[in-house]
């Protein structure tokens, strides 16, 4: 259903006691009305293709599972906005007091400036390649299933889900982090893991170097040096054993890498010397009476 002039102009009506707002549209038997109580307006799964101008006073606006491609200016009073599973290609400027933004499963290529009050940002399943600067108040960031190539500096997050992107590295992780999901990226190494981390999912990455795992890590899903590991309800002793094994693997790989490097260097040196000692370059030294042995 479209909230548009073809069905009659929508309008807002405020109750006499100022405790609720109603939106109505359509004509005759097709008229529909939705009320909001205590500043909460739920328009989920109503087939909407557009919205009328929104009045002030709305604190929580839920627009999930519609067919919206854009939103009108948002009321400055808004604290919660959920607009998942629409066709949004952009968002309007966000109110300064907004705390929760859920815009999953749209067609967003960028996000507007995030308000300093934002606590939760969920923007999974979009077309994002970058994120704006993250506010210091942010606690939960869910940005998986996008095309993000790098993350901005992270505030004191509790949960970070950046799975299924195109990340080559992660920024330093905050000490407050409890859960990290970075599955299916292009990560070759992980930064130092916070001591409070409880959940780590990092499968489907070509990780070559692992930091020590936190002692209190409870859930682990990763690919270590070609070995797939999935652990649940781990103990500090088990984590210590894994760390010991990983250090051993790392040392072995470093030694093998050193040997491969020396072998490659020997080949490169031989190829270089073949060019340097080509007859056309050697002849001038012989003519000058220079002993070639002194140059080896």
Question: What function would you assign to each model-found segment?
Answer:
Residues 46, 63-66, 86, 106, ...:
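Consensus "Asn ladder" position of solenoid repeat domains
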Residues 6, 19, 24-28, 80-81, ...:
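Low-complexity, intrinsically disordered segments with a bias for serine/threonine
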Residues 168, 173-233:
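Ankyrin-repeat and related helical/solenoid repeat scaffolds used for protein-protein interactions
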Residues 51-54, 71-74, 91-94, 111-114, ...:
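Canonical leucine-rich repeat
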Residues 90, 110, 123, 127-130, ...:
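Leucine-rich repeat
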Residues 21, 41, 61-63, 81-83, ...:
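Conserved hydrophobic beta-strand positions in leucine-rich repeat
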Residues 1-50, 58-60, 226-296:
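N-terminal capping/linker segments that flank leucine-rich repeat
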């Amino acid at each position: 259903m479209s909230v548009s002039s073809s069905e009659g102009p929508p309008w807002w009506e405020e109750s006499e006691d100022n405790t609720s707002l109603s939106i109505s549209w359509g004509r005759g038997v097709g008229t529909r009305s939705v009320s909001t109580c205590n500043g909460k307006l739920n328009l989920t799964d109503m087939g909407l293709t557009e919205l009328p101008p929104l009045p002030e006073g709305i604190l929580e606006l839920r627009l999930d599972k519609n067919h919206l491609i854009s939103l009108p200016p948002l009321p400055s009073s808004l604290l919660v906005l959920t607009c998942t599973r629409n066709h949004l290609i952009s968002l309007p400027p966000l109110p300064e007091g907004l705390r929760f933004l859920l815009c999953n499963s749209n067609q967003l290529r960028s996000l507007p400036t995030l308000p300093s009050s934002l606590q939760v940002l969920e923007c999974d399943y979009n077309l994002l390649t970058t994120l704006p600067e993250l506010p210091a108040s942010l606690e939960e960031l869910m940005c998986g299933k996008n095309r993000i190539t790098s993350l901005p500096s992270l505030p004191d997050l509790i949960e970070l889900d950046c799975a299924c992107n195109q990340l080559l590295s992660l920024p330093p992780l905050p000490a407050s982090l409890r859960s990290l999901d970075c599955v299916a990226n292009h990560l070759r190494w992980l930064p130092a893991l916070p001591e409070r981390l409880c959940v780590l999912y990092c499968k489907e990455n070509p990780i070559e170097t692992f930091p020590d795992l936190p002692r209190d890590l409870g859930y682990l899903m990763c690919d270590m040096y070609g070995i797939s590991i999935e652990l649940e309800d781990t103990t500090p002793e088990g984590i210590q054993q894994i760390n010991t094994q990983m250090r051993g693997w790392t040392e072995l790989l470093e030694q093998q890498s050193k040997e491969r490097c020396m072998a490659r260097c020997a080949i490169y040196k031989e190829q270089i010397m073949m060019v340097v000692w080509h007859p056309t370059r050697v002849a001038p030294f012989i003519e000058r009476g220079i002993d070639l042995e002194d140059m080896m």
